[in-house]
Amino acid sequence: MTNFSSSPPIAFGDLQGCHAAYRQLFDTLAPAADTPLWFAGDLVNRGPASLATLREIVALGERAIAVLGNHDLHLLAVAAGIRTLKPGDTIGEILDAPDADDLIEWVRHRPFAHFERGMLMVHAGLLPQWDAALALELADELQRALRAPNWRDTLRSLYGNDPNCWSPDLKHADRLRVAFNAFTRIRFCTPEGAMEFRANGGPAAAPAGYLPWFDAPGRKTADVTVVFGHWAALGLMLRENLVALDSGCVWGNRLSAVRLADDPAARVVTQVACERCGAADE
């Protein structure tokens, strides 16, 4: 991993093509040129300017650390012919762009997890049996598979809900699928780590027998700060070792960024309103 400065990184929540809100937030923050910029996934889709958003993040070069979210992977799957565009998708402009191939390649080479300064960033979450080392090992397996020449076949095999819980005995596609779903889809799980994929409300709406993944008893990543997005109904949430960043910009709420100081008490939140996102073209 690359360290550009001793400055704490700034982590952004799900942009989802909300380019105007991102520009406003970036300009408000006015980060120094060497400040690392982290993005918790879902750079694109549903917002009105997915193409402009993606191009801008790509242009940041190695300064930008962006993990893969479910909408970013949906873009790859549509580009690969594995899935089709759905109502509400706004990624068609990326697929039709003259630089589409370069943009797709950039997305395909993003990581599923990033660990630095004692902080682990993923898009959605982690299973309770994983410590940081195992999470990074699984992320690396997924990353290498998606960067291989047969990545389309691999991506096709990753979609599905089963198995829905971790076992060290899992192999091949089953092992990768569980990791894929935890990194990019999880919100709720049982205390034993069995994932549930239908519920998308806040913690109070947890199905019977389930709880937010980060509250699973004995979670082995409780000793690091986990930074994640994905869960708009949860909203911005900061605990000593937890930073939830998706505050529902694409739904007309707010876009959030957090300056990730090593001391939790020194972490600074900056937000902008997102009234225009999803309502009209920029």
From Swiss-Prot:
It comes from Burkholderia pseudomallei (strain K96243). It comes from the Bacteria. Its EC number is 3.6.1.41. GO terms for molecular function: bis(5'-nucleosyl)-tetraphosphatase (symmetrical) activity. Belongs to the Ap4A hydrolase family. Coiled coil: none annotated. Pfam families: Metallophos (PF00149). This is Bis(5'-nucleosyl)-tetraphosphatase, symmetrical. It catalyses: P(1),P(4)-bis(5'-adenosyl) tetraphosphate + H2O = 2 ADP + 2 H(+). InterPro entries: ApaH, Calcineurin-like_PHP_ApaH, Metallo-depent_PP-like. PANTHER family: CYTOCHROME C5, PTHR40942. Hydrolyzes diadenosine 5',5'''-P1,P4-tetraphosphate to yield ADP. SUPFAM superfamilies: Metallo-dependent phosphatases (SSF56300). Keywords: Hydrolase.
